[in-house]
Design a protein with these regions (language model features):
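Terminal alpha-helical segments
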Residues: 1-143
Length: 143
């Protein structure tokens, strides 16, 4: 993906806004106890934040598994992001799959509630890394 600095900033800003909105949606549904919906919104909040990070660094993924792989390869393995945060991101993905597609198991408060604060912290860390990188980028196309 070849983007100018302005284009990259626009895409990254959009993803960050989507991450924040999805997290707010997750919080807003807690009182209704829609555990699958909360799991879905937590995952998509993290996914959009991680996607923004990858785009800021010029990485391009074409699937959810690709985003997980690139996040692990470029941020978790080198120690930029803690291993526990990489595992949390993968857990959010797995929980979203269970909530969206598993016809034999319904998520419960015990599955979902303990992940809200760690997900918020992960999203904040990833957005901070993204913003730091974006501050370094000049208005030149990616090579």
């Amino acid at each position: 993906m070849s983007l100018s600095a302005d284009e990259r900033k626009a895409v990254v800003d959009f993803r960050i806004e989507k991450a924040r909105r999805a997290f707010e949606q997750a919080q807003g549904v807690v009182a209704l106890e829609y555990w699958e919906t909360i799991a879905n919104r937590l995952y998509y909040a993290a996914y959009n934040a991680v996607s923004a990070l990858l785009i800021a660094y010029g990485y391009s993924a074409h699937s959810h598994n690709g985003v997980i792989h690139l996040f692990g390869q470029h941020f978790v393995q080198p120690g930029i992001v803690d291993v526990k945060d990489g595992k949390l991101y993968h857990r959010l993905f797995s929980m979203r799959l269970t909530g969206d597609y598993d016809d034999t198991y319904g998520l419960t408060s015990d599955d979902v509630l303990p992940l809200i604060t760690p997900a918020s912290e992960l999203i904040d860390k990833v957005i901070e890394l993204t913003n730091t990188k974006m501050a370094e980028i000049k208005d030149t196309p990616e090579e």
